[in-house]
Regions:
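Hydrophobic beta-strand residues of extracellular immunoglobulin-like
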Residues: 61-64, 127, 164
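Extreme N-terminal starter segment of soluble prokaryotic enzymes
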Residues: 1-3
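Conserved beta-strand-loop-alpha-helix junction that forms the acyl-donor binding cleft
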Residues: 100, 126-137, 153-161
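Acidic/polar helix N-cap motif
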Residues: 7-10, 133
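Conserved GNAT acetyl-CoA-binding A-motif
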Residues: 116-128
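Acetyl-CoA-dependent GNAT
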Residues: 5-8, 16-100, 106-119, 150-153, ...
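Conserved acetyl-CoA-binding loop of GNAT-fold acetyltransferases
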Residues: 141-149
């Protein structure tokens, strides 16, 4: 497996993997009608077309995990300026559903933490996860994250689901176990 920065040419593949991850993980949080309808893919394509455009703010990092054949198997997106009062935001960490449990999430999180620490050494790394996404909650607990806040999601398709904000303090950014 290799880790490489994303380019504009990766937008469609990242959008497709993002949606595959949502479909495997967010049933019961997002409606099936949304997840299975054309709006979800259009939503993800618009997001990644924008994030990977050349005029997107330079302070962002989208890291791709590719298998030995070059297929996209995971990605992480760090947005340092998205929530400056909370810390450096890890906005996305997704692994292809068929590749979960192989250490890819751990490697992506470790790489995201290293990049965040280099950009903003005095800021914590933070992320939001749906409380009902039990496998992700367990993963972040194992990775040493601490729940520091709860909120009702502002995502209109989340139906008022609760999100947990996890944080890793800046002084405590050792390699992920």
């Amino acid at each position: 497996m290799t880790m490489v920065p994303a380019t504009r040419a990766d937008a469609d593949a990242v959008a497709a993997l993002h949606l595959a991850s949502w479909r495997a993980t967010y049933r019961g949080i997002f409606s099936d009608a949304f997840l299975d309808g054309p709006e979800a893919l259009a939503n993800r394509r618009a997001l990644w077309d924008g994030r990977l455009a050349s005029d997107f703010p330079a302070r962002r990092h989208v890291l791709l995990a590719r298998d030995d054949d070059g297929a996209l198997v995971g990605f992480a997106c760090v947005l340092p300026d998205q929530e400056p009062d909370a810390g450096v935001l890890l906005d996305n960490l997704h692994v292809h559903p068929a590749r979960k449990g192989q250490g890819l999430g751990r490697q992506l999180l470790q790489a995201a933490r290293a990049w965040a620490g280099a950009q903003e050494p005095a800021s914590p790394l933070v992320l939001y996860v749906f409380e009902r996404n039990v496998s992700a909650v367990r993963f972040y607990d194992r990775m040493g994250g601490t729940v520091v806040a709860r909120r009702v999601s502002g995502n209109p398709v989340a139906g008022g689901a609760v999100e947990l904000r996890y944080a890793w303090p800046p002084a405590h950014r050792p390699a992920v176990p």
